[in-house]
């Protein structure tokens, strides 16, 4: 079995494949790829349990592909600066490709472009379409936001005020989910009060919710856009003895989120398929580096469908997701 390296730091999904290159026409083939062996890296944007599932996908691809070795990294502080340090280190180690989830796509464009001159660069989870990345693998986040907006309307048929929570609004996936929610709520009797950010600080994520419950005692709904926001919202609502009185819509499948759905404390969660992010990113990078680009559409965006988890299907989903987590 090929060696699979996990370095526990924090980041979003980035896939870069390739080797050193001397022109702007894209990555050239290095010694290892010319010999048929590829070293691929997957870089996340934080250390959420979400990425544990993505890692299982990369491991499956790693085990299936005899000519591929995968290195998995999580940036501890979830910053663009740490992502750059990781990418520089991976380049120094001679990887052929990197799949990354850019924390701040707009301000990381130059870093991604410089990297793409040397190796194959792929984005996952959060896209950077203005960069020279080869393609994106992940959720259609505008569509996912529309789904979340529809769930908010279901949970609040009489309307009301809602607050949204997310780590960073610089991330494209956050921006697009917010866009989708706003589109879905347009013309409804639901008012978005604001979007509170926490810079991926879990303590701050919860305090943002607690502060909202005090400042806006009539708030009817709370929406978490990133995976850890769901548990943070749930914990703050429980502490305030407002379980059931305030409707919660979340994203992703952290344990406490699924438990909250099962208990009826969370109305629903929109789950992505991070296993497929990892699995497809590695397989497609290999295929791309081997010269076969047929799997990449003209849009350069490979969308993985989302699922809606409510009380009636949470048990079955939890069983399946725990299998992916190796539990």
Annotated model-derived regions:
Residues 41-44, 94-102, 122-124, 163-166, ...:
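Periplasmic-binding protein-like
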Residues 72, 129-151, 164-168, 195, ...:
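Short beta-strand elements at the ligand-binding edges of bilobed clamshell
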Residues 105-143, 161, 252-262, 266-267, ...:
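Flexible loop/hinge segments that line or gate small-molecule binding clefts
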Residues 99-115, 181, 199-260:
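Hydrophobic alpha-helical
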Residues 83, 137-162, 204-206, 253-257, ...:
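Hydrophobic alpha-helical segments within soluble ligand-binding/sensing domains
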């Amino acid at each position: 079995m090929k060696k699979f390296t996990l370095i526990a730091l924090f980041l979003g999904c980035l896939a870069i494949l390739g080797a050193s290159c001397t022109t702007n026409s894209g990555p050239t083939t290095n010694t290892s790829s010319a010999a048929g062996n590829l070293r691929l890296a997957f870089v996340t944007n934080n250390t959420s349990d979400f990425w544990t599932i993505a890692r299982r996908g990369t491991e499956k691809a790693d085990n299936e592909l005899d000519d591929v070795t995968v290195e998995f990294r999580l940036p501890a502080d979830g910053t663009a600066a740490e992502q750059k340090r990781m990418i520089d280190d991976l380049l120094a180690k001679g990887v052929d490709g990197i799949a990354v989830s850019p924390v701040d796509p707009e301000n990381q464009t130059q870093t991604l472009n410089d990297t793409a001159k040397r190796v194959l660069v792929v984005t996952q989870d959060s896209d950077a379409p203005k960069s020279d990345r080869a393609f994106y693998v992940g959720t259609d986040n505008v569509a996912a936001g529309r789904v979340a907006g529809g769930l908010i309307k279901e949970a609040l048929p009489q309307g009301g005020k809602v607050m949204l929570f997310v780590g960073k609004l610089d991330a494209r996936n956050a921006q697009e989910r917010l866009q989708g929610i706003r589109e879905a709520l347009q013309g409804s009797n639901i008012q978005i009060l604001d979007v509170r950010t926490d810079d991926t600080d879990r303590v701050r994520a919860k305090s943002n919710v607690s502060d909202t419950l005090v400042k806006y005692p009539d708030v009817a709904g709370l929406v978490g856009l990133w995976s850890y926001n769901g548990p943070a919202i749930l914990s703050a609502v429980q502490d305030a003895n407002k379980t059931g009185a305030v409707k919660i819509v979340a994203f992703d499948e952290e344990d406490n989120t699924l438990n909250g759905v099962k208990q009826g404390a969370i109305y629903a969660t929109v789950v992505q398929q991070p296993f497929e992010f990892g699995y497809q990113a590695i397989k497609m990078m290999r295929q791309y580096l081997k010269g076969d680009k047929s799997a990449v559409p003209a849009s350069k965006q490979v969308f993985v469908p989302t699922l809606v988890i409510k009380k009636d299907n949470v048990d079955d989903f939890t069983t399946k997701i725990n299998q992916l987590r190796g539990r």
